[in-house]
């Protein structure tokens, strides 16, 4: 084999490299939070949501989804059924996140050779990395009039001596998506029987 010379600096860390990262945090994150992880990130450049109803929506990065998009929780791989079946919801709750990172390009190789689409890292402090001074808490409630969705989120965290603790909970309830008036497919109208049309005349559109 021919000799190969590799030259690099001694003290460069992964954080020092140029990474194509989108970061959602603070007020921007609170404004963008949706019912699912995919809906939360849908406004980011190059990201869409593979929606299977009000409660299921996985992020799609540059057309890649499922196991080609690595979902992390605090930098640790999150294994759930959503990686192999898009009609399952991610086990991560975006309403509990303090920030969400979306990583694309060659930098995704840092997280394994399967993340060719990208990486979504959700930081929610469920595993505390430092001691909390005193006790902190958060309580938030959201309502969606389209699906009559109600979401309540609460967390409490603190420390006792050298032990950090964190408790959180989420309650979510959603109904069908409803619209005012009617939603009729013109193609189906040609094949609909008269009795069905009479029933539709007094019904409200439901998706």
Language-model features and meaning:
Residues 1-30, 38, 66, 124:
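Short, acidic, small-residue-rich periplasmic hinge/interaction motif at the N-terminus
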Residues 38-80, 98:
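Extracytoplasmic beta-strand/coil segments of soluble accessory domains associated
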Residues 34, 66, 160-163:
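Outer-membrane beta-barrel channels and translocator barrels
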Residues 134-140, 144, 151, 155-207:
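Periplasmic-side early beta-strands and strand-to-turn transitions of outer-membrane beta-barrels
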Residues 52-54, 90, 113, 144-149, ...:
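Transmembrane beta-barrel outer-membrane domains
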Residues 11-13, 66, 78, 125, ...:
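Structural signature of outer-membrane beta-barrel domains
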Residues 77-106:
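Short acidic/polar hinge/loop motifs at secondary-structure boundaries
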Residues 37-40, 57-60, 69-72, 87-92, ...:
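N-terminal periplasmic accessory domains that precede
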């Amino acid at each position: 084999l021919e000799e190969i010379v590799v030259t690099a600096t001694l003290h460069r860390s992964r954080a020092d490299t140029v990474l194509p990262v989108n970061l959602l945090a603070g007020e921007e994150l609170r404004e963008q939070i949706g019912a699912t992880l995919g809906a939360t990130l849908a406004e980011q450049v190059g990201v869409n949501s593979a929606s299977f109803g009000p409660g299921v929506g996985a992020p799609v990065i540059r057309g890649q989804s499922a196991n080609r998009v690595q979902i992390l929780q605090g930098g640790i791989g999150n294994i759930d059924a959503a990686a192999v079946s898009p009609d399952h919801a991610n086990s991560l709750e975006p309403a509990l996140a303090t920030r969400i990172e979306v990583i694309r390009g060659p930098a995704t190789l840092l997280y394994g050779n399967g993340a060719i689409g990208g990486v979504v890292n959700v930081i929610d402090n469920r595993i505390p990395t430092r001691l909390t001074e005193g006790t902190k808490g958060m309580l938030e409630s959201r309502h969606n009039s389209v699906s009559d969705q109600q979401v309540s989120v609460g967390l409490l965290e603190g420390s006792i001596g050298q032990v950090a603790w964190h408790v959180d909970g989420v309650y979510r309830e959603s109904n069908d998506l409803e619209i005012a008036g009617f939603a009729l497919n013109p193609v189906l109208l040609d094949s609909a029987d008269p009795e069905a049309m009479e029933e539709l005349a007094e019904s409200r559109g439901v998706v």
